[in-house]
Regions:
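Acidic catalytic/metal-coordinating carboxylates
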Residues: 35-38, 60-64
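Short amphipathic alpha-helix used as the core "switch/output" element in two-component signaling
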Residues: 41, 63-74
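C-terminal output helix
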Residues: 88, 106-119, 123, 127-129
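Two-component/phosphorelay signaling modules centered on CheY-like receiver
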Residues: 13-31
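Receiver (REC) domain active-site loop signature in two-component systems and cognate sites
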Residues: 57
Length: 131
């Protein structure tokens, strides 16, 4: 069976490399971007199975990219990965169409599990965000 194709965007190049490296063991990372506009263009071009987006990116933020993708019927599941832990922000991401939300501090423990859940259509939010 083919490995799921994933796209990753984060405005921090070092964290972006770390994410791509972490995910490469189980997914094919087809492309990466450091801003929201480039992310949108590359997602439309490569048509990945999953998308991981930072929340705070230049040009378009993760919620704006998610909202834009959600307008398409063929949109892949989007997982927001952010340092932002405010429950209102988590809810805004969900309302924009995000399938899941993972805190960056929990990436090592939760991201792969979250992505597998998103592929199966199951929502996931970092347990520490549920209060």
């Amino acid at each position: 069976m083919a490995r799921p194709r994933i796209f990753v965007a984060d405005d921090n190049p070092a964290f972006l490399r770390e994410l791509a490296s972490l995910l490469a063991a189980e997914f094919d990372v087809v492309a990466t971007a450091t801003d929201g506009r480039s992310a949108l263009d590359l997602i439309r071009r490569y048509k990945p199975d999953l998308v991981v987006l930072d929340l705070a990116m230049p040009v378009l933020n993760g919620i704006e990219v998610t909202r834009e993708l959600a307008m398409s019927s063929s949109s892949p599941p989007v997982v927001i990965c952010s340092v932002e832990t405010d429950p209102e922000v988590v809810e805004a991401a969900r309302k924009a169409g995000a399938a899941a939300y993972v805190f960056k501090i929990r990436v090592q423990k939760e991201l792969v599990l979250t992505l597998k859940s998103a592929l199966q259509g199951k929502p996931f939010v970092s347990p520490s965000s549920i209060q």
